[in-house]
Swiss-Prot record:
Site keyed Transition state stabilizer: positions: Y429
Residue segments, region Disordered: 464-495
Glycan attachment positions: N142, N235, N272, N352
Family the entry assigns: Belongs to the peptidase M28 family. M28A subfamily.
Cofactor dependency: Zn(2+)
Domain named PA: residues: 124-218
Protein residues bound to Zn(2+) 2: D271, E304, H430
Origin species: Arthroderma otae (strain ATCC MYA-4605 / CBS 113480) (Microsporum canis)
Summary of subunit composition and partner proteins: Monomer.
Record's keyword annotation contains Secreted: yes
Protein name: Leucine aminopeptidase 2
Domain of life: Eukaryota
The keyword Metal-binding belongs to this UniProt entry's keyword annotation: yes
Amino acid sequence: MKTQLLSLGVALTAISQGVIAEDALNWPFKPLVNADDLQNKIKLKDLMAGVQKLQDFAYAHPEKNRVFGGAGHKDTVDWIYNELKATGYYDVKMQPQVHLWSHAEAAVNANGKDLTASAMSYSPPADKITAELVLAKNMGCNATDYPEGTKGKIVLIERGVCSFGEKSAQAGDAKAIGAIVYNNVPGSLAGTLGGLDNRHAPTAGISQADGKNLASLVASGKVTVTMNVISKFENRTTWNVIAETKGGDHNNVIMLGSHSDSVDAGPGINDNGSGTIGIMTVAKALTNFKVNNAVRFGWWTAEEFGLLGSTFYVDSLDDRELHKVKLYLNFDMIGSPNFANQIYDGDGSAYNMTGPAGSAEIEYLFEKFFDDQGIPHQPTAFTGRSDYSAFIKRNVPAGGLFTGAEVVKTAEQAKLFGGEAGVAYDKNYHGKGDTVDNINKGAIYLNTRGIAYATAQYASSLRGFPTRPKTGKRDVSPRGQSMPGGGCGHHSVFM
C-alpha cells in the first residue's frame, strides 16, 4: 500500500506540474505485466496489418524497398516513432547517423556459360574483366591459401571460417583481379564486404552447386571467367528509433531489438518486417501494464549493410550506461514461410559459441515457452551475425528467436516442423518476393507471443538471472568452423 501511495503521489505531483502524459496518469492503477495476459494481447490481425503497412511504404516509391536512407525506410521509422509517441507510455527518440550506402550488381560467365551471381556490397567495380580462374585453398583466409600464380587471375574461394571482407582483401593482396566466393550450403550467396577497403578485389557470390562445378573444372583443365561488377556508393542519413517505458527501474533495463531496413531487391517483409512488427506489437500491448524493470525497444537501421545501426547505438553508450542494459533480445525474421522454430544457442551446447553470462538463461526461457505448449524447437548458431553482435561484443547477455533464411530445410526438420524438405526456410530471402504473401501467419503469431512471454518475464522480475557481467570486449568471430545461419545479416552478410 505504501508503494502504491508513493506512486500515486509522484503521479499527482507530475500532474500539478503539467508534465505528464495521459497514459501515465493511469500508471499506478495498471496491473503488473504477466506472461499470460501480455500474450493474450497479441492478435494476428494486428501483425498482418503491420507488415502490410511496411509493404505499402515500400511500394509507395519507385524503388519498392525499404533500404536505409531511402524514402520507404524513412516512412518506416517515422511511422514507428509516431505510433509509439502517441501512446504516451514511452520516451521515444530518433537517433540520426550517416552511413555509406552501396548498390552493386554482378555478371559472371565461365567458359561461355552465364552463372547466377550477386555482387558483394562495397565491392570495387570490375569492367568486364576476363582471366583464368584459380582456386584458393582452405577457405582463402590467409596469404598462404593463394597460389603463386594468382596475380592477374580471378580466384575462386569457398565460403567459411573468415568474413567475405577478409577473403576479398587476401585475394587483393595476392594481386587477383577478381574474387568469386561460392556458398558452403545449398543455395545462392549474397553478402557484404563490410565497408570500403582498397585491399578488396571485385567480389561476387555464387551458389554452392556452381562453385563446386567450377572447382572441379579447374582441377581438370583451364577455366576462363569474365566478370562484371557495377558499384554505386552514397553517404546517407538514417535513423534508429529507441523507445523506453517511462515506468520501471531504469537501472535495470530489458532491451529488445529488430532491424527496420530491407535490402535493395524488395520490401523486406519477413526480413525484417516480421521482427519490426513483432516487437512493435508487443510494445503496444505492454502499454496496458506496469513494469518493475524498464523496457527499451530498438529499431535498428542499416543492418543489411553490416549491422551499422545497432553498432552505432552500442558505441554511443559508455560502460556505465550500457551496464544498465541487463539483457538484449533480438528478433530477425520470425515469419519464414518454410519455418523452423529456432532459439539462439546461448549456452553454446550446439555450436560451441557461448554468449555472455545470462545468454544461456535466455535460451532456457525460450525453450520453456515452446516446451510448455509441446511445440518443437531447435538451436541456431549464436555467432553474432545479427544485431546482437554489438551487444555481445560488450558482454551484454543476449538471445532471441529466428525462423530461418536461405538454409535448406532437411527431411528431419520437415518431420519436426512441417513444411517442405529440400526447400529453403525462406525461398524469397533477400529477393523481391519477400512480401506480405511470404509471411507464414502461424510462425509470426507464435514467435511474437514468444517475444511477449520473455518481455513479461523479465519486465516483472530478474530474479534468478545471473549478475550482469562487467561491460567489456569479447571476440565473437566464429573461426575454424562453418555454421548454419542465425539471422539475416547473420547467415550470409559477412561469412
